[in-house]
Amino acid sequence: DAAGNLMGRLYPDNWNEKELHGVIATGSHIDTVRNGGKFDGLLGSIAGIEVAQCLKENHVKLKSPFEVILFTDEEGARFNAGMVGSKVIAGLGMERPLSEYTDNEGISEEAAMQKCGYHPEKLEEAVYADKYEKFVELHIEQGIVLEQESRQIGIVTGIKGPYWIEGSFEGEANHAGGTPMNMRKDAMTAAANYIAEVEKIASRLGDMFVATVGTLKVHPGGINTIPGRVDYTIDIRDTDMERRAQGIREIKEAAVKI
């Protein structure tokens, strides 16, 4: 579709292909995060295709259309957008225009999609959430709980909705050798203290609440220069939205205090 989602579909006998409703779907995403697991997304994608192949080879008579979806840009690892393909299908839209989501080289997601042959200007044509009756996804755990408990598979009871924060600590860049410790305004020291506070807040709010300071960018970034600014990102998640909101509030307040 216009967003780059890939779909394959099997129809029941004598089904009018123009009438899409009651679709049973499966699938997953085809992007991943760094060190996210080599089967992240791929497991559900390949499993869906395998199911479709088995249905066809065994001449299973379908009562409803069966669809395999490979979602694009689920993780948001490059542009910090995330869930782009599924949001388009569901008609939810993005918080900002795709032209405002950029990677580390300044390339926008809109430009990258166009380079791939997608059509970000026609995303509204890819909205068709109403046609689905059911959706199921096979996915790796991306954790160690099942492994530690020697369990092969588990059933998801909730998804930890992510909330991302981007912020900066401003200090004063100076020479590392000529500036006494008591006269420094070191942005990295502030960032380090903040990371420790984020860890404390997350640990106090319980096992389901997690917060991760995933990236730091130090400016100007010299071995012999006191950092003048540190940019950071935080990934905050919980299955309980009220508790997540509480954690977000406390984490933001901690930054102000520091």
Question: Whereabouts are the PLM-identified features?
Answer:
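Acidic/His- and Gly-rich active-site-bordering loop/insert found
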Residues: 1-37, 55
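FAD-binding core of FAD-dependent oxidoreductases
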Residues: 32-46, 78-82
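Short amphipathic alpha-helical face segments that pack within enzyme cores
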Residues: 42-50, 189-193
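Short amphipathic alpha-helices in soluble, non-transmembrane regions
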Residues: 246-256
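Beta-strand segments within the central parallel beta-sheet cores of soluble alpha/beta enzyme folds
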Residues: 3, 25, 61-72, 210-215
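Short, solvent-exposed loop/turn segments at secondary-structure boundaries
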Residues: 37-40, 179-182, 246
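Midchain, well-structured core segments that form catalytic/ion-binding scaffolds
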Residues: 31, 73-74, 78-241, 256
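Phosphate-handling active-site elements
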Residues: 18, 52-67, 97-102, 200-208
